[in-house]
């Protein structure tokens, strides 16, 4: 089997031979089109070889018939003193036509018994040739359709590939952008951690109480919220005492007790707030 390079070279030589001095139509060179054109060139080469053999055979037959005609002419001249030169123009024309027909039909003589079978065979050959020609036309039409469909499919695939490459490029750009953002965020996070650590070390060196750190302040804020929640029922309890009409001394005692509890809670609350303000 011929290599792809040899096939491409043979196709180029065949196209140059077919089109001669005319320019070869542009076509896309790929393995599919090269294979199709290679098979066509092979068939053309086989057909040319067969035609050459037929021509050589006909030349040989013509030479044989010319020799036979010369022999018959000599025989006529010797036997009946007959010469084609003695024929009229129409007679010479008919005789030449008869000889040419005999040569073309490849028959041994010009008798009717030889002409009729030869004409029948020639007619059969003509029908077979026409049938073969129609088959080749149909096959060539199929090949052209397949070639067209292949070229269209190849064009579609190229367009799809181009779209996929563009989409891949866009996705790659997005990924690169996200990676850059991620690297930036990582760098910022490391910078913040380093800054926090440096600030903590600096504050610790200045003697700052660890209880005033952000975490401790957040815990104090939660504790403050809890204390505020605890004062709510005490305030309600105090309000309920204010609404009653007991003995003045007992009521005053309860009020003072509630006020002391409330003052203690508010004092603790104020202390916590002051610490948070620092």
From Swiss-Prot:
Residues 49-79, 128-178, 249-277 form a coiled coil. GO terms for biological process: cell division; centrosome cycle; spindle assembly. Keywords: Cell cycle, Cell division, Coiled coil, Cytoplasm, Cytoskeleton, Microtubule, Mitosis. GO terms for cellular component: centrosome; cytosol; HAUS complex; mitotic spindle microtubule; spindle pole. It is found in: Cytoplasm; Cytoplasm, Cytoskeleton, Microtubule organizing center, Centrosome; Cytoplasm, Cytoskeleton, Spindle; Cytoplasm, Cytoskeleton, Spindle pole. Component of the HAUS augmin-like complex. The complex interacts with the gamma-tubulin ring complex and this interaction is required for spindle assembly. Associates with microtubules. The interaction with microtubules is strong during mitosis, while it is weak or absent during interphase. It is unclear whether this interaction is direct or indirect. Interacts with EML3 (phosphorylated at 'Thr-882'). Belongs to the HAUS1 family. Contributes to mitotic spindle assembly, maintenance of centrosome integrity and completion of cytokinesis as part of the HAUS augmin-like complex. This is HAUS augmin-like complex subunit 1. The lineage of its organism: Eukaryota, Metazoa, Chordata, Craniata, Vertebrata.
């Amino acid at each position: 089997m011929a290599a792809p390079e040899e096939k491409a070279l043979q196709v180029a030589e065949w196209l140059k031979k077919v089109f001669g001095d005319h320019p070869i139509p542009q076509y896309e060179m790929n393995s599919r089109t090269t294979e199709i054109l290679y098979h066509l060139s092979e068939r053309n080469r086989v057909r040319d070889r067969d035609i050459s053999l037929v021509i050589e055979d006909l030349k040989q037959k013509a030479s044989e018939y010319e020799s036979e005609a010369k022999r018959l002419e000599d025989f006529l001249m010797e036997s009946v003193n007959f010469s084609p030169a003695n024929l009229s123009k129409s007679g010479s024309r008919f005789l030449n036509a008869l000889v040419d027909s005999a040569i073309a039909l490849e028959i041994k003589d010009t008798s009717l018994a030889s002409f009729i079978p030869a004409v029948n065979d020639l007619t059969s050959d003509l029908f077979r040739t026409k049938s073969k020609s129609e088959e080749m036309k149909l096959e060539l039409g199929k090949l052209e359709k397949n070639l067209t469909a292949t070229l269209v499919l190849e064009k579609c695939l190229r367009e799809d590939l181009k779209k996929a490459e563009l989409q891949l490029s866009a996705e790659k750009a997005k990924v690169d952008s996200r990676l850059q953002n991620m690297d930036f965020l990582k760098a910022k996070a490391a910078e913040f951690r380093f800054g926090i650590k440096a600030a903590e070390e600096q504050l610790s060196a200045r003697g700052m109480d660890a209880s005033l750190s952000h975490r401790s302040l957040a815990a104090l804020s939660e504790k403050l919220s809890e204390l505020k929640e605890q004062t709510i029922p005490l305030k309600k309890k105090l309000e309920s005492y204010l609404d009653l009409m007991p003995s003045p001394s007992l009521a005053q005692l309860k009020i003072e007790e509630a006020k002391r509890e409330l003052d203690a809670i508010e004092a603790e609350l104020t202390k916590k707030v002051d610490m948070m303000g620092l």
